[in-house]
Design a protein with these regions (language model features):
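Short, conserved beta-strand segments within well-ordered enzyme catalytic domains
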Residues: 34, 82-84, 105, 114
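Residues embedded in well-ordered beta-strands
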Residues: 105, 110-114, 275-277
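Short hydrophobic/aromatic-enriched beta-strand-loop microsegments
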Residues: 81, 101-105, 237-241
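Short, Asp-centered acidic motifs that coordinate Mg2+ and/or phosphate
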Residues: 13, 79-83, 221-222
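Structural alpha/beta surface segment adjacent to cysteine/selenocysteine redox centers
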Residues: 89, 108, 117-120
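Exported/periplasmic ABC-transporter solute-binding proteins
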Residues: 16-19, 23-67, 74, 117-119, ...
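Pocket-flanking alpha-helical
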Residues: 65-99, 231-232
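N-terminal Sec-pathway targeting helices
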Residues: 1-14
Length: 342
């Protein structure tokens, strides 16, 4: 009898321990949102609003460089929704088996040069030069003033934070912006990108968010980052001209004329949009589509982050989108904008 009782106790203990183990290892049943590192705060706000409206469980956003996240997603991480700042990350070549063939652009942003409130005199001098250029009305004098500002910025007297162009679109756009500046102010597209390399003026990291701490500590003087990220992180910033900021959708053709080479190949300029898509083979396909469908019309709060919610989001697709998205197109709430690049 005693042996029987002991055996029963042992079985119970084993079952309890196994149950505990299963509880620990059990995967989350909530939606998993992967988002560009600069937009974690905005994505978390969207997630909270969606949860409050629907009651659906969504995990806090997982951030990283958009190109790096696309690679991780293609390798099978349990992502449901992908919020990226680069349309090319939704291509089949980027997402592999997770490619769904569609994405919507729902908000616009722009590139800025951020600096810390405790900036030193050299940084403040360069800020002043950009301010002078911005306020100059005469066109030729304005170009000369911007040339002077960029000559000082790229002289090596301060270090500039630029994320890796192959892992983070913010870094790609920083180099594209410098290429455009070279074309406009020096008649030599690669002038400023070569100059910062020769003067060892750049501190790089995998994504722009990793460079905020060095900026605040004074290890770098400036950081190329999106305006919304600068605002959410409490940074001061220089607004760049429309030609250099990728913040003017009417200049799309102009931006596309400039290219920069990364490990993924030749990349061209484009207006900065924040995109979202439900991934193929996701953790909860129906809920993923519902989350993306929720964004249009419920993203006006993004203006407080310095973003511009699109009055009519743009659909990019190579495959037939889900019924809910098609319904929004039919109702005129979303407009077709073209294919996703290969």
């Amino acid at each position: 009898m005693r042996k029987t009782v002991i055996a029963v106790i042992l079985v119970v203990l084993i079952l309890v321990s196994v149950g505990i183990g299963l509880e620990i290892d059990r995967p989350s049943t909530g939606l998993v949102v992967y988002t560009a590192d600069a937009y974690v705060a905005e994505s978390d706000a969207l997630i909270a609003n969606f949860h409050n409206a629907t009651g659906m469980a969504v995990e806090p956003a997982k951030g990283g460089g958009s190109y790096t996240l696309a690679q991780e997603i293609s390798q099978g991480v349990p992502a449901s929704v992908f919020i990226s700042v680069a349309l090319s990350t939704y291509a089949r070549s980027s997402l592999g088996p997770r490619y769904s063939g569609w994405a919507i652009a729902f908000a616009a942003d722009q590139l800025v040069l951020a600096y810390a409130s405790s900036a030193n005199s050299t940084v403040e001098k360069i800020v002043g030069l950009f301010s002078t250029a911005n306020s100059t009305e005469n066109a030729s004098q304005k170009d000369a003033a911007y040339r002077n500002a960029f000559m000082n910025l790229t002289s090596g007297s301060v270090r500039i934070g630029i994320s890796n162009a192959s892992s983070d679109p913010a870094g790609l756009r920083a180099y594209l912006s410098l290429e455009i500046a070279g074309s406009l102010y020096e008649n030599s597209q690669s002038f400023f990108t070569k100059r910062i390399s020769e003067n060892k003026a750049v501190r790089a990291d995998s994504n722009a968010a990793e460079l905020v701490s060095p900026l605040l500590s004074g290890n770098i003087g400036f950081l190329y980052i999106y305006r919304s990220a600068a605002i959410s992180k409490g940074l001061k910033y220089i607004e760049l001209p429309g030609q250099l900021s990728f913040g003017n959708s009417s200049m799309s053709q102009f931006y596309s004329e400039f290219h920069y080479n990364t490990t993924a190949g030749d990349q061209s300029g484009a207006p900065i949009y924040l995109y979202a898509s439900a991934l193929a083979n996701g953790t909860d396909p129906a809920a993923s589509v519902e989350f993306v469908s929720y964004i249009p019309g419920n993203d006006s709060f993004l203006s407080s982050y310095g973003m511009k919610p699109l009055e009519k989001p743009l659909l990019f697709n190579n495959t037939q989108p889900p019924a809910g998205i098609r319904g929004m197109v039919s109702a005129g709430r979303i407009v077709y904008a073209g294919p996703i690049p290969a």
